[in-house]
Amino acid sequence: MLSFQYPDVYRDETAIQDYHGHKVCDPYAWLEDPDSEQTKAFVEAQNKITVPFLEQCPIRGLYKERMTELYDYPKYSCHFKKGKRYFYFYNTGLQNQRVLYVQDSLEGEARVFLDPNILSDDGTVALRGYAFSEDGEYFAYGLSASGSDWVTIKFMKVDGAKELPDVLERVKFSCMAWTHDGKGMFYNAYPQQDGKSDGTETSTNLHQKLYYHVLGTDQSEDILCAEFPDEPKWMGGAELSDDGRYVLLSIREGCDPVNRLWYCDLQQESNGITGILKWVKLIDNFEGEYDYVTNEGTVFTFKTNRHSPNYRLINIDFTDPEESKWKVLVPEHEKDVLEWVACVRSNFLVLCYLHDVKNTLQLHDLATGALLKIFPLEVGSVVGYSGQKKDTEIFYQFTSFLSPGIIYHCDLTKEELEPRVFREVTVKGIDASDYQTVQIFYPSKDGTKIPMFIVHKKGIKLDGSHPAFLYGYGGFNISITPNYSVSRLIFVRHMGGVLAVANIRGGGEYGETWHKGGILANKQNCFDDFQCAAEYLIKEGYTSPKRLTINGGSNGGLLVATCANQRPDLFGCVIAQVGVMDMLKFHKYTIGHAWTTDYGCSDSKQHFEWLIKYSPLHNVKLPEADDIQYPSMLLLTADHDDRVVPLHSLKFIATLQYIVGRSRKQNNPLLIHVDTKAGHGAGKPTAKVIEEVSDMFAFIARCLNIDWIP
């Protein structure tokens, strides 16, 4: 590889902060101001090296052409019924945003109901959340611009898809819950703040409040229904009970799967909703999660992890709510995790479990909890479901590494509850029968068995010669289940690659126990698990260190950056997308304070001791051995990422280039690409997705000398 001339970047050696008696230098703290001329010049100088490097990758054009060709397949959501109509999302293939369609019946003609593509020239305005009124006659929907988490809520009359004048601003991380009379909707908003709020700012998000908006009135008249002046981090989302009588308020403080649960009986609000509601504090601690399923009168069914890390269903009678009186409806499974539950046809429950990172779907009886039926499913994930208490049918969508999607429909009024294939999608150009998926369990450093999926062409020789792409996340109780990815399958098909997904601790793959095994003082387990995944792939002959790429985004960006610092010898290439890199300061920006439940917070001496040991920004060092250099690294971020603000990646790349990049033995590139009019990832237009994956895989091909296989 060629050596790189990186930009000269100012280091402020006087920027020193004292953490519990430890002096920590932060020479690139000036990059924390996104609007300064200096930061803008830094971004421009970095993109000036990276963009040509990516464009000169011989494979980039071939990859982009193939991606554009193969990604051009129809993408459907499940149909869902609202009032008397059916709705579904559909993308013909390469549309920037999927379109919402309406039908009067399943056989009826489909009409466009809402097309976000006409709201911008470049597809950067995206639908972010929506809610229909109970009778299906009114529709509220959130729009976000350029990938920001900030949302503007608008309203439509469903009949004739007529736009209404109501507009709600300063909305973020919001519920959308209509009262059943259709007169208005609960939502969340933040107070006005100094400076801008367009997704390029870094100011912290505190004091979220719950409001009720009456349709046809101005936002300034909205009714404040809940606020927590003494608890600035609390966020309270509202939901209406199935019978419309109760408002349930779920209060969260961070990202842990725990919440308080307050409720208000709307029949007690004799004058309607006029101010702060009369909240009854059913659960007033953060010792478990309570997820509302349905209720029969005052008996409420919740999915909970209270004394059940794999989750169970309990009934709580609001007239006698003592914990000793709670009844177990469906007990916790000893191994499988209960992921979600829905009530349908008034007396059925649909339960979705995760069994060794593969979904299973079951039908239970609401009155007794008894198992009635197991729906047949291949090995893979349930990625879509629709069916509410008043519906008599369900739709669910299945996907896997090699199947783009099958939607099933089941009519629950029939004697034989047999689901039928409602819609199946195929991708022309990739023959699934040429490839295989295996799941293995490898030992981590402490002996814990970690699951990993491996996808590759059938019949390959395990001689260590193949490029491999290892993906991981490992945080926030999020399970990484099989999903269909054209971009990764192109790597397998045209770059002779092996795809691996490691289900490391910190995720929710085996419930709250698995999550807790990879957070706070145990965070190093995530990095050990991931490094052991790499070692397994190498030992078994799938790949070799110089042919191995690791990739992750957000918390997964933290993962791969930390692994590069800890084991630079183990990987050939690292692609870190929108990563959390400064573990001492992350809690100071936008919604970062919510992640202290997983990471801890440097304000605490004990937490500081954990964080300083692995924080990517603070652990960059030149490898001592002469024959070891850092892997090729590409950091990706964007100007409107207000979830993980870009300063994380900017400060990290400056540090890498200074400490490692100036060394004569460092021939592998250390680069960053900062996109514009893009954010953390949600709602990213197809055109940008194609550019991004073309950059990623072109970088891998160029750095690891991979040839294109026609």
From Swiss-Prot:
Query: Modified residue N-acetylmethionine is at which positions?
Result: 1
Q: Does the keyword Cytoplasm apply?
A: yes
The organism's place on the tree of life at top rank: Eukaryota
According to UniProt, the tissues expressing it are described as: Ubiquitous.
Of the GO CC terms on this record, one is: cytoplasm
EC assignment: 3.4.21.26
**Organism (species):** Sus scrofa (Pig)
UniProt keyword Protease present: yes
Q: Which reaction does it catalyse?
A: Hydrolysis of Pro-|-Xaa >> Ala-|-Xaa in oligopeptides
Signal peptide range? none
Q: Explain the purpose of this protein.
A: Cleaves peptide bonds on the C-terminal side of prolyl residues within peptides that are up to approximately 30 amino acids long.
Enzyme class, first EC level, given as a word: hydrolase
- Short name of any one Pfam family annotated for the protein: Peptidase_S9_N
State the protein's name: Prolyl endopeptidase
- GO MF term (any one): serine-type endopeptidase activity
Sorted keywords for this record are: Acetylation, Cytoplasm, Hydrolase, Protease, Serine protease
Question: Which cysteines form disulfides?
Answer: none
